[in-house]
Amino acid sequence: MANPKAKMSKSRRDKRRAQFNARTKAATTVVCPNCGEPTLPHRACRHCGHYRGRAVVTKSANS
């Protein structure tokens, strides 16, 4: 029976497990309170550029 040659660190083990979880779980979205578009939590809104009630990204008129 095969045995591991060296101990796998917790960091390497968790990196491998994270890849599986990233592929199988759908991304969580929240509704932007400023524009109402779905956006990723803890990120600035990609549509209006607001985060936590402030404009943190300036959006140009043609984008």
Swiss-Prot record:
GO terms for biological process: translation. It holds the Pfam family Ribosomal_L32p. Residues 1-22 are annotated as: Disordered. InterPro entries: Ribosomal_bL32, Ribosomal_bL32_bact, Ribosomal_zn-bd. One of its GO terms (cellular component) is large ribosomal subunit. The keyword Hydrolase does not apply. GO terms for molecular function: structural constituent of ribosome. Keywords: Ribonucleoprotein, Ribosomal protein. Residues 7-18 have a biased composition (Basic residues). The keyword Ligase does not apply. NCBIfam families: rpmF_bact. Belongs to the bacterial ribosomal protein bL32 family. HAMAP family: Ribosomal_bL32. This is Large ribosomal subunit protein bL32. It comes from Chlorobium limicola (strain DSM 245 / NBRC 103803 / 6330). The lineage of its organism: Bacteria, Pseudomonadati, Chlorobiota, Chlorobiia, Chlorobiales. The gene is rpmF.
